[in-house]
Amino acid sequence: GIKDWIKGAAKKLIKTVASHIANQ
């Protein structure tokens, strides 16, 4: 459902931000 999609999107966003910070 929507909640599962939001959880998945949040995890992807966190991974993207974390890797972006690590690359700096």
Curated annotation (Swiss-Prot):
Keyword terms, alphabetized: Amphibian defense peptide, Antibiotic, Antimicrobial, Secreted
GO biological process, one term: defense response to Gram-negative bacterium
Recorded GO CC terms: extracellular region
Location of the protein in the cell: Secreted
Source organism superkingdom: Eukaryota
Major site of localization recorded for this protein: secreted
UniProt KW Coiled coil keyword: no
Tissues expressing the protein: Expressed by the skin glands.
Annotated family: Belongs to the ascaphin family.
Role according to the record: Antimicrobial peptide. Synthetic peptide shows higher potency against Gram-negative bacteria than against Gram-positive bacteria. Has a very week hemolytic activity.
Name of the protein described by the UniProt record: Ascaphin-5
Organism per entry: Ascaphus truei (Coastal tailed frog)
